[in-house]
Curated annotation (Swiss-Prot):
GO terms for cellular component: cytoplasm; nucleus. Keywords: Cytoplasm, Nucleus, Sporulation, Transcription, Transcription regulation. This is Developmental and secondary metabolism regulator veA. The gene is veA. The C-terminal PEST domain is a region rich in proline, glutamic acid, serine and threonine residues that is required for the light-dependent regulation of development and secondary metabolism. Disruption phenotype: Reduces sporulation capacities on nitrate-containing medium. Results in the abundant formation of conidiophores. Leads to a reduction of gliotoxin production. Decreases the production of fumagillin, fumitremorgin G, fumigaclavine C and Glionitrin A. Also reduces protease activity. Component of the heterotrimeric velvet complex composed of laeA, veA and velB; VeA acting as a bridging protein between laeA and velB. Residues 315-335 have a biased composition (Low complexity). Gene3D superfamilies: Velvet domain. It comes from the Eukaryota. Residues 25-231 form the Velvet domain. It comes from Aspergillus fumigatus (strain ATCC MYA-4609 / CBS 101355 / FGSC A1100 / Af293) (Neosartorya fumigata).
């Protein structure tokens, strides 16, 4: 089967010129050149919304017009009179198929025009890229997909009689015009020449590859005031269709370079143990903690500048120590306390708290050594059921031998308010007698430091001397229904219980829901708090007030109800 030879391009493709003789005997030559060829377009379709659905041909076609004047017998010496020639020009664009097709017998003309938009353009005299007249078509759309080419027709309106054609009759300028009777228009248009563009493809909406960036010619024309839409980025196809080889514009690289701008920044999601607290001086974090180090930090008295509140400072295994007072202790002390870390260390590296070997002058007056009375309040504000603050949920790592899970008493949550005092033998004896029936639970200061072992007796050696709180912990008491400190409605016990020594107290029973120091201007060394090492909760101060004062109940942010005694009126 013989192959069909390729179609020859028309003679007036891309460039076309024509000459004529004027009345003065001058030879005028018109030259049209398609400076910017159309390459692609998206079919806008037909229907009610097609007028609003404009899909312009990309890039917009630009046709250049230049006019030359010469002697009829000398074509070598031509003068460019494009700017000096006095006439009106406009260019009319039509659409035709790239491959002519024979009309069938039963097929009629198309019901609707295939080319839409603005097919007419006036001349614009520009200085760049060169001095000439330019026709710009920024709003041309094609309704159906296929292979087409544009045909541009130049029309001229003559203003000077001397520039008219040689064979045309002379118009009668002196004839009077009758305004009452309509007459034919005096001005008329002359067709000069036609130029065609190269074939371009109109794609369907699914196959349309997209729009490329505006060309340099479009930018130059737009800079001189012409109406041309400028695209500064590639708007290529966003779908994943397979690209054809006849289209060179590929947006895979363009979208690959800027895909990170629109991607959710979740490439690195650090856990709570990896996120160091901003106020911490350490750069490492112990990942063995069940809770993140930044979730345990709460504002303490030292953070607010209250350094003189020494009764709030106590020694606990869960408290962190600053590295400053560490060198004053002996190496044996460091070796004794080097194996225990606190969940409140805020990511500090190997912080120890030498409790039994306190110097004569308390070293915990600095803000870094001040014990914050908010140990685990940040992650537990709900009522405790007795098993919430065990060896694992209180912030301690479970495998550590320092805090056995089967310990019968004296857990972190079961400790009453403590007070840090200089080492005194009588106070230590009184504390051991009042706190527990086991005399070996708390060693004296004369006991030499021994290596720590995972036993309950050795675990208590890290506790400082204790001081009995006067008035509240002198004897165990069970709140009853007749007691004014027992809430019948909610069943909450307003005072701490100390009689259940063999069972672990809950966090609420030990600390209370509102036990926070330095609130409402209260101080621990005031007269209404004698010999108190730590501020009681508000309902724990009920015995110090008279029964005639009213109670105030309000709801906290976590939804719990809190009762307070109204202040005395002057």
């Amino acid at each position: 089967m013989a192959t069909r030879p390729p179609l020859m391009p028309p003679a007036n493709e891309t460039e076309s010129s024509v000459s004529r003789i004027s009345r003065e005997g001058k030879k005028i030559t018109y030259k049209l050149s398609v400076m910017q060829q159309p390459e692609r377009a998206r079919a806008c379709g037909a229907g009610a919304k097609s007028s609003a659905d404009r899909r312009p041909v990309d890039p917009p076609p630009v046709v250049e017009l230049r006019i030359f004047e010469s002697d009829p017998n000398d074509d070598l010496h031509k003068t460019d009179i494009t700017f000096a020639y006095n006439a009106n020009f406009f260019l009319f664009a039509t659409l035709e198929t790239a491959r002519p097709m024979a009309q069938g017998r039963l097929t009629g003309p198309p019901t609707c025009p295939v080319l839409t938009g603005v097919p007419v353009a006036g001349v614009a005299y520009l200085d760049r890229p060169q001095q000439a007249g330019y026709f710009i078509f920024p709003d041309l759309s094609v309704r159906h997909e296929g292979r087409y080419r544009l045909s541009f027709h130049l029309y001229e309106e003559i203003k000077d009689i001397k520039d008219a054609d040689k064979d045309t009759p002379m118009p009668d300028l002196n004839s009077s015009t009758n305004l009452t009777k309509p007459s034919a228009p005096k001005a008329h248009l002359n067709f000069r020449l036609e130029v065609k563009s190269v074939p371009f493809t109109v794609y369907s909406a699914k196959k349309f590859p997209g729009l490329a960036t505006s060309t340099s010619l479009s930018r130059i024309i737009a800079e001189q005031g012409c109406r041309v839409r400028i695209r500064r980025d590639v708007r290529m196809r966003r779908r994943g269709e397979k690209r054809t080889d006849d289209y060179d514009f590929d947006d895979e690289r363009a979208f690959a370079t800027r895909s990170d701008r629109y991607t959710t920044p979740d490439m690195y999601a650090a856990n709570s143990a990896e996120r160091a607290r901003s106020t911490s001086i350490s750069t490492t974090a112990d990942t063995s903690f069940p809770y993140g180090s930044d979730a345990q930090r709460r504002p303490s008295a030292g953070d607010y500048g209250f350094q003189g509140a020494q009764p709030y400072q106590r020694s606990m295994p869960a408290a962190s120590a600053a590295p400053a007072p560490a060198p004053v202790h002996s190496p044996a002390t460091s070796a004794q306390t080097s194996s225990y870390q606190s969940h409140l260390s805020f990511g500090a590296t190997q912080s120890q708290y030498p409790a039994p070997q306190l110097p004569p002058t308390p070293q915990s007056a600095t803000p870094t050594n001040t014990y914050s009375p908010h140990p685990s309040y940040s992650h537990s504000r709900n009522p405790s059921n007795g098993t919430e603050y065990d060896a694992t949920s209180s912030g301690y790592p479970y495998p550590q031998p320092r805090l056995p899970a089967d310990r019968p008493s004296y857990s972190k949550a079961a400790l009453p308010p403590l007070r840090l005092e200089p080492p005194k033998a009588p106070n230590m004896q009184t504390s051991t007698d009042s706190r527990s029936s086991d005399a070996n639970a708390y060693p004296t200061l004369s006991q030499p430091p021994v290596p720590r072992a995972p036993t309950p007796a050795n675990h208590v050696t890290s506790l400082p001397p204790l001081k009995v709180l006067s008035g509240e912990y002198s004897h165990p008491s069970q709140p009853n229904a007749q007691s004014p400190h027992h809430d019948l409605g909610s069943g909450k016990r307003l005072l701490w219980e100390t009689n259940h020594t063999l069972s672990k107290r809950s966090h609420e029973e030990t600390f209370g829901s509102d036990e926070r120091p330095l609130h409402n201007g209260m101080r621990p060394d005031m007269d209404q708090y004698p010999s108190m090492g730590r501020k009681q909760p508000d309902y724990g101060r009920l015995p110090f007030y008279t029964d005639s004062r009213d109670e105030m109940a309000y709801k906290r942010a976590n939804g719990r109800m809190v009762m307070k005694i109204l202040p005395a009126l002057p």
